[in-house]
UniProtKB/Swiss-Prot annotation:
GO cellular component: plasma membrane
Gene Ontology molecular-function annotations: electron transfer activity; protein-disulfide reductase activity
Subcellular location: Cell inner membrane
Keywords associated with the record: Cell inner membrane, Cell membrane, Chaperone, Disulfide bond, Electron transport, Membrane, Oxidoreductase, Redox-active center, Transmembrane, Transmembrane helix, Transport
Its biological purpose: Required for disulfide bond formation in some periplasmic proteins. Acts by oxidizing the DsbA protein.
Lineage top rank: taxon: Bacteria
Name of the protein described by the UniProt record: Disulfide bond formation protein B
Disulfide links within the chain: 35-38, 94-122
Transmembrane segments: 9-25, 44-58, 64-81, 137-155
Topological domain ranges for the Periplasmic compartment: 26-43, 82-136
Cytoplasmic side, ranges: 1-8, 59-63, 156-161
GO biological process: protein folding
Length: 161
């Protein structure tokens, strides 16, 4: 069980970081400029990945890290749902996103601007990836990863009862 749970969390971390890597590929190779909501979704994926790695390292507090990973996922899902809704109804956006100043003022945007600096519009029409928008894919993956963490936590709690 120990090796299985390590592999489980490592896989979640690998997928999470891989998706951030894919976002960077889209940014640097395909010219997709990240908007503030995109950056916030990156934070969610990074949170899921980091908390999953901590669950591998700190076995005694694994449920805590798993729960924080789920919380990161739920926050990311909320942002992705809002982002998809903006894409479906672009008139709901005023074109100027006040969130951009806040995201760009975060220390991460100063330290790693290539990854965390936002200079795109949330309603900018970008080419789809395999038929879906990037925020839609983000929503799907955030849901899958969060659900996977939740199911693992529920199964773990049942085993301790």
């Amino acid at each position: 069980m120990q090796a299985n749970s390590r592999a489980y969390f490592l896989l979640i971390a690998f997928i999470s970081f891989g998706l951030v890597g894919f976002a960077l590929y889209l940014q640097f190779e395909k010219g997709y400029q990240p908007c503030p909501l995109c950056i916030m979704q990156r934070f969610a994926f990074i949170g899921i990945g980091l908390f999953s790695l901590l669950a591998v390292i700190a076995q005694n507090t694994r449920s805590l890290w798993q729960g924080l990973g789920m919380l990161s996922g739920v926050g990311g899902i909320a942002v992705a749902v809002y982002h998809v809704s903006l894409l479906l109804n672009p008139k709901a956006s005023c074109g100027i996103d006040p969130l951009e100043n806040w995201v760009n003022a975060l220390p991460t945007a100063k330290v790693l601007p290539q990854v965390f600096y936002s200079d795109g519009l949330c309603t900018a029409p970008l080419p789809p990836v395999l038929g879906l928008s990037v925020p839609a894919w983000s929503l799907i993956w955030l849901f899958i990863l969060t659900l996977t963490l939740a199911v693992g936590l529920i199964r773990r709690e049942k085993n301790f009862r």
